Amino acid sequence: MSQKQLKEAFVSNLSGTSVLEVTQGLCFPAFCILCRGLLIIFSQHLCSFLHTWTTQFFMDFVVLIVPLVITLTVLSSFILLENLTVILCGAWLLYQIYHRRTCYAKVPVQKVFASFLKISLESEYNPAITCYRVINSVFTAIAILAVDFPLFPRRFAKTELYGTGAMDFGVGGFIFGAAMVCPEVRRKYTEGSRFNHLRKSLYSVWPLVFLGMGRLVIIKSIGYQEHSTEYGVHWNFFFTIIVVKLITSLLLIIFPLNKSWIVAISITVLYQLALDFTPLKGIILYGTDGRGTRVGLLNANREGIISTLGYVAIYMAGVQTGFYVFKRRAQVRDWIKATCWVFSVAVGFFISLNIVQVNVEAVSRRMANLAFCLWVVASSLMLLSCLLLSGIVLSFAKFLIKGALVPCSWKLIQSATTNRQSESLIVEAEKNKPSFCLITALNRNQLFFFLLSNVATGLINLTVDTLHTGAFWTLAVLSIYMFANCLVIYVLDLQGKTIKFW
């Protein structure tokens, strides 16, 4: 077998891991983000630690990126233990901050909590959603290279037909995250007709057409390894995003924003019925001729084309989630209720997933069936609830330390009884503070980070024999690869540059 065939076989015919293990792995970065915020407060105001852009970058890289690299490689069998360790570290940091607090120093704990619950959280964007999207981007960047090394567990790679591998979450999670911040949710198009909004949406996808065609041409011209049952012969991630964006833009013109959940459920159920009671499933698996040939546009790309329906449903679920999370809430207690609600819905979806897998069909990324949609939405909501909870805990730590500033976190506003001058000072202090933050940098240039990671992955695969690389060199390559990618994005953010293609 050629090197290309060996690499294709290495990522083929896999069955994935348990839903629980994937969920534990997804929640792990949320707790790392909490620890990072608590560590910043602890070091800034209790240890007189000097924060320059270099020290902040190294702190972010070590606390946010390195643990995820290790989790996906050498410590992949100890995800639960890693979660518990990070939670305990966070609890210790919070304990230290509380007992060295500069605000409410001599006030009983009950009154401290009562005062905190009356605080408002001001934010031009929701840090939990920002962190959700960044986590998905970082996870994808690590996984697309790590999967070609033996150190990366095969159970985390994409499954062949049925199952839940960690990488199976990637595209669905990306689409869910994009939906939460889509223009319709952010009320970006507030003027003009609905068809004018559709025209703007059509215009916004042309860079993706360029990127999708560019990737197709490059992959075919250099003979790079492919997994044809993932999307098909010509289809790729960018084409899926294009079709999903076009269909959902039309749906959001027809249906009210707050009814997106009804659209999502309707599409998913009807699509599953079509899979069960029409030849659609057979077409996805074996083509129109029943022999699995790749002749003709539909047969060549049947997985990518048909599975788009499932991703449309995921997008609409993301729109509904964004609509709910971006609602204005007066006090911290309202955000606690919202977090509990998101968590409860996530649990409900996991229960529904179990029922569907037992009685209807198992999770299949290849078909993006009902179970897959339930799994992606449930996992996304669970991650989001962990991030919301982390944000609330971090806000409590900031509340205890006067002048505490943490990039990419909620800004605190005193209650209505506090004078307006002190309120504005709190917000302005955070606005005027330089943001040395890897999360903010990655969020600013997410698409460029994804492209940079893909190019670097391709170059490494063409120059390194990944199939026969030991554990030490695998970790070295992955660490250098992520360090270089993150540093480029970080420097761009320091210079105030956003790389756009339109």
UniProtKB/Swiss-Prot annotation:
GO biological process: GPI anchor biosynthetic process; protein localization to plasma membrane
Enzyme Commission number, as recorded: 2.3.-.-
Localization (cell): Endoplasmic reticulum membrane
Pathway involvement of the protein, from the record: Glycolipid biosynthesis; glycosylphosphatidylinositol-anchor biosynthesis
Swiss-Prot/TrEMBL keywords: Acyltransferase, Endoplasmic reticulum, Glycoprotein, GPI-anchor biosynthesis, Membrane, Phosphoprotein, Transferase, Transmembrane, Transmembrane helix
Entry superkingdom: Eukaryota
Pfam family, one: GWT1
Residues carrying covalently attached carbohydrate according to the record: 13
Family from the record: Belongs to the PIGW family.
Protein name: Glucosaminyl-phosphatidylinositol-acyltransferase PIGW
Species: Rattus norvegicus (Rat)
Classification of source organism: Eukaryota, Metazoa, Chordata, Craniata, Vertebrata
